[in-house]
Amino acid sequence: MFICCKAPARGFGKGTKTLSKFDNTSYASIARISTSTHRSALHTRKASSSAKERQRADREQLTRLLKESPGKRDARNFLKQFDAPKPKKGEGSTAPKAKQGTSEVVRKDPGTTRTGVNLGNLYQPTVFTREPLPEKKYEEEDKEEPLHLALVKLRQPQNLDDRTLGGIALTLSQMAQLGLSTAVVLDCAEYDSEDLPQIDGAYEKMLREQAARFVATLEEYNEPGALLIEHALGKTKEQNVIPSTVQIRGGVEVKNSFLLYPPIDDGVIPVVLPIAYDSDLKKVAVEADDVVLALIREFAGIAAHADRGAFEMSEASSGNKDLDDAERPILDRIIVLDPLGGIPSVNRADGAHVFVNLEAEYRDIKLELQRLSAAAGDEAKSKPAVSLGTGNPFSKFVEEEVATTHGGSKHHLANPAPMRHLKNLDVVQRALRILPPTSSGLILTPTEAARKAIPDDDRSTPSKNPLLHNLLTDKPMISSSLPTSPASRFLGSVSPNPPTFLKKGIPVTMVPDPRESGPWRPPSASNPSIELAEDPRINFPKLEDLINDSFRRKLDAKDYLDRIRGRVAGIIIAGDYEGGAICTWETPASLRGVKIPSQASETPDSPYWVPYLDKFAVLTSSQGSGGVSDIVWAALTRTGFPEGVVWRSRTSNPVNKWYQERSTGTWNLPGDQWTMFWTTNGVTKRWDGNEWDLGQSNSLTRWEAYVDVCNGIVPSWADGIKRAD
C-alpha cells in the first residue's frame, strides 16, 4: 500500500524519513474505497506537519516586523492576506514562545541562514532567522487558516545550470516561509510548434531526468520536500467546444486530484509534467500551458463539461465530492519563468511592459505582439540564411543567450520569440479571468527568480528578488508610470526583458476617448469642451465623492464647475471611480482678454491653451496598492497629453516625491506654497509673438506661461479656506 507523504528534508539539517519521491497509481484504489470522512480529512486545509508549524512561526515573526516597520504601507496587501488568524481567547500562540531566543544550534545551522528572507532596505530588520519552536501536537480545531498557492511554470529547465535551478528552489522555499505554497509545471519543449512532441523513449527520459533533477533540488531547500506527480492528468477529445470566457484547449483535465491536495497540504511542492492519459490510458504529450489552465480550473473549483454550452461545477469527475470551496487553496499567483523574460513593448525604452492592466490593455498588447511576430516571420522568409541575432532583438537574445546554454540547440529555437511572448500573455490572461481580482501574474526569467536576496558572502551586495518583492508589495519592481531612461533602451541589447506584472485589472474610461479622436485638443467651435455635470458618460456625484475622499476635503462643486466651464480637456476614470484625473486648458493671465487666433485650437502647443492637470485623485482605500495611480497616470501622459502637461501641488504634500519621479522638471513657485511640475520637454522654448498675435508681449516662453497659469489657479473648496489643494 502506497501513501503520499513528505519527501526528505535536507535543507535545514533535519532528518526525516526517506520516502518515495514519486506518486503511484496504486494510491487510487485507496482513494476510491475510502469513506467520505477519510477523504474529507485527507483534503482538509489544516497543516499538520512540524515543518508547516515552523513556517507558520516564521511568518508570524515576519508579519510582526512588517507591522512595526516603515514599509508597512507597501506591505499592507501582504499583511491582509497572509497574516495568521488571531488566536482564540485562552489559546497560547507559538509566536511568543519562539520569540524568547535563538538557540545555538539554529544560529550555527548554515541551512537556516541560507533560506532566510531578506526584506531589503524597506523593511527593518533586513534579515530574520529561524528560532526554536516547541514540538507539540498540532491542534487542528484551533488552527484553521486558508492555504495560499502560487502556480509556477518553468520553461526549458534543461537549459539551466545547477546554480540557477538551486536559486529558484531557494526562492520557492522562501515564498513558502512567507505563507505562499507553490506547485510547479515543467515545460521542456525546445521550441513552439503546432505539433506536440510524441511520447517516445528519448523525450520521456528527458522529462523524467529534468523532473528528478528539480525535485532533488527542491528537497535541498524546502523542508517538507517535493513530489513528482505523474498520474493526475487526463485528456479528452473536447477542444474549444464551449462558448465561454473560460476557454478550453486540448481537453486537458485533472482526473486524480487526490494526488495533488495532500502534498500541498503538508507543504510539499508538487512537480507536474506535461503528460496526460487518454481514454485508453495511453500516455500523450500535452502543452504545458494547457496543464497550467487545467490545474487552475481544478484549484478554482471549475470543471469543464460541455452541457448545452455551459460550465457546471463537477465534483464527481475529479474525486472531490467532499472538497468544498472553503477547503480549496487560494490561487494567488500565476508565475511564468521564461528565458525571454517579460512581455516586450515597442513604446518603452526598457523594452518591456512592467505592469499590464489586462482589462484595458490586453487587446492592444496582443495586436502589438502579433505584428512583431508577423514581421519576424516575413524577415525570416526574406532572409533565410541570415542569423536570427541580426534581426529581431527578441530572437537575437534567444540565439545568443539561450541557445548556447547547456543542452540547447540553435535550430530548435528558430521560431520568433514574439509568438512565445504571445502565448505567455495568453495563458496568464486566461487564468486571471477565472480567478479573483486579487490574483495576479508575473512573467520573468529563471535567472531573476533565482536572484539571492541574501548573498553568499559579506562582500556581495544584496539585491531584491522580483518574486519576493512582488509577494510582499503586490507591485512590480519598477513602477509602470515612471519614465524610462534612454540608457536602458532595449533595442540593440541582448538582455532579456524585465519582469512583467499582470493583473486582471480595472477598465479605464477616457472622455473624450483619444483612441477614437486622437490626443486631446483645445476647445473650438467644432470641438466644444465637455460639461462634467451634464455629460451622460460621466457620473458627476461619484466623481465628486472620489475627489472628496482623495483630498479629504469637500469640493465646492458649483464654484469648481463655474471655474473650469468651457476649458475641460478631458477626464480619466479608473474602474468604478476608484481613481481619476480632470484635465483642463488654461490661459495665462497675461493673455486673458486677447482674441485667440483660430490656429491655436488646432494644436496643444500654443501660448493660449496650456495643458493642465487640475485634479488627480485616488480613493484612500486604493492608494498604495492595486496600481490605480499608475493606471491613471499612464493614461494621462501616454494617451491624453503625450506631448506634456503641467500641474502644481502644495510644497508640503507627501505625494510630491511620487510626482517628482514622474516629471521632467520641478520648481518651487514664489511664496513657497506651491511646487510646479511638468512632463514637457523644452520648457524654455519661445513662441514667436508675430505668429501668435501676442501683441505687446511679442514673445512668450512655455516656462513663463506655466508659471503664470500655476500662480493664477484659485482652489474651490467648500470650507472656504484658501489653503493649498
UniProtKB/Swiss-Prot annotation:
Biased composition (Basic and acidic residues): 51-91, 451-461
Protein name: Amino-acid acetyltransferase, mitochondrial
Any one Gene Ontology cellular component term annotated for this protein: mitochondrial matrix
Catalytic function, reaction form: L-glutamate + acetyl-CoA = N-acetyl-L-glutamate + CoA + H(+)
Taxonomic source organism: Phaeosphaeria nodorum (strain SN15 / ATCC MYA-4574 / FGSC 10173) (Glume blotch fungus)
Transit peptide, UniProt annotation: 1-46
Occurrences of domain N-acetyltransferase (ranges): 527-702
GO biological process: L-arginine biosynthetic process; ornithine biosynthetic process
Enzyme class name: transferase
Superkingdom to which the source organism belongs: Eukaryota
Membrane spanning stretches: none
Swiss-Prot/TrEMBL keywords: Acyltransferase, Amino-acid biosynthesis, Mitochondrion, Transferase, Transit peptide
Compartment annotation: Mitochondrion
Covalent S-S links between cysteines: none
Pfam (any one): NAT
Record family assignment: Belongs to the acetyltransferase family.
